[in-house]
């Protein structure tokens, strides 16, 4: 019987009938599935905003290309920095106004600061006294608060956290929000739950301001009042090459919680090297000549509200602190896959 059935399969007439039968069944099942899908989606008007194009500005945004060859400094997947000529023309008047005012202020400061005395030169030869402190950033006005930008995973369509940075009645800054570790089910994001505030104090035409005047001080000084969470201080030092755009130096900021202020003095020698937030094997001391920004990040994997109040950020000098660098580093052998 099996041999007879196999022989019938080899006949062209029978084979054609069999193919026609299965193709008919497949067509009917596909049409049924399509009609069922259409009936389920009928009346659905929701729109997904996961693929919305991020607005790109010419100046003052974190998405500005560093140069024309590498328009994606953060390495974001699917990032498109292109914008139309119409958007560029519409933004030019505001850009010309803001950048012109900033340029005039720079020229005014350059001529007003002409003096025989050079404070930084005096500091370089040892004129910074013991226990001398200098406040660099206050938050008592809205103009000073505008120097800081905030962000969280929901801003990048990668999570559900929220954050805000506002002035308080006491002339301080309140960095608050909610951390959510719920992962977005898009098949790309693996973990979520972070929020940050970062200094974006730049010169005219988006030129960097370096924190080189801190080089003669031994500690970073902060006056904060937290909620018991552990934050992270980051000194950002990206250079011109693309493989250095994620370079930063980090140190934890442990807050006590409660109503009392805490004065945190963090030695610059204890900041460790990180790239995109990841600790590196090769460690070296932070070079403040290359540091152009400072940030505070929360990513402790704890869901819930957070609140950090900041009075000021500055520097402090302790002449008894002689430590150059607090950490050992892994030294590669002479012959290795990374070269000499």
UniProtKB/Swiss-Prot annotation:
GO biological process, alphabetically ordered: mitochondrial electron transport, NADH to ubiquinone; mitochondrial respiratory chain complex I assembly
InterPro entries: Galactose-bd-like_sf (IPR008979), NADH-UbQ_OxRdtase-assoc_prot30 (IPR013857), NDUFAF1 (IPR039131)
Protein name per the record: Probable complex I intermediate-associated protein 30, mitochondrial
Record keywords, A-Z: Chaperone, Mitochondrion, Transit peptide
One Pfam family cited in the UniProt record for this chain: CIA30
Similarity-based family: Belongs to the CIA30 family.
Molecular function in Gene Ontology: unfolded protein binding
Superkingdom of the source species: Eukaryota
Coiled coil: none
Subcellular location: Mitochondrion
């Amino acid at each position: 019987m099996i041999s007879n059935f196999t022989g019938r399969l080899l006949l062209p007439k029978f084979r054609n009938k069999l193919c026609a039968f299965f193709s008919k069944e497949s067509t009917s099942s596909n049409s049924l599935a399509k009609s069922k899908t259409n009936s389920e989606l009928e009346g659905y008007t929701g729109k997904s905003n996961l693929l919305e194009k991020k607005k790109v500005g010419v100046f003052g945004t974190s998405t500005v290309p560093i140069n024309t060859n590498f328009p994606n400094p953060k390495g974001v997947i699917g990032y498109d920095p292109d914008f139309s000529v119409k958007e560029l023309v519409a933004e030019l008047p505001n850009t010309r106004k803001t950048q012109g005012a900033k340029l005039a202020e720079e020229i005014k400061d350059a001529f007003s600061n002409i003096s025989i005395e050079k404070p930084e030169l005096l500091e370089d030869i040892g004129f910074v006294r013991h226990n001398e402190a200098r406040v660099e950033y206050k938050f008592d006005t809205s103009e000073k608060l505008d120097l800081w930008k905030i962000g969280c995973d929901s801003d990048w369509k990668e999570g559900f956290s929220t954050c805000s940075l506002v002035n308080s009645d006491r002339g301080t800054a309140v960095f608050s929000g909610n951390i959510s570790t719920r992962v977005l089910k898009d098949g790309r994001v693996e973990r979520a739950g972070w929020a940050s505030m970062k200094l974006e104090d730049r010169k005219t035409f988006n030129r960097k301001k370096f924190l080189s005047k801190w080089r003669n001080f031994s500690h970073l000084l902060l006056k904060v009042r937290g909620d018991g969470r552990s934050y992270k201080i980051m000194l950002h030092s990206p250079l011109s090459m693309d493989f250095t755009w994620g370079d930063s130096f980090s140190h934890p900021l442990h807050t006590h919680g409660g109503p009392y202020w805490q004065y945190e003095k963090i030695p610059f020698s204890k900041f460790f090297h990180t790239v995109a937030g990841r600790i590196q094997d090769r460690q070296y001391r932070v070079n403040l000549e290359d540091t152009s920004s400072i940030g505070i990040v929360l990513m402790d994997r704890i869901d819930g509200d957070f609140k950090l109040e900041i009075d000021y950020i500055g520097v402090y000098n302790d002449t008894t602190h002689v430590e150059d660098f607090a950490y050992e580093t892994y030294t590669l052998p002479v012959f290795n896959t990374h070269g000499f």
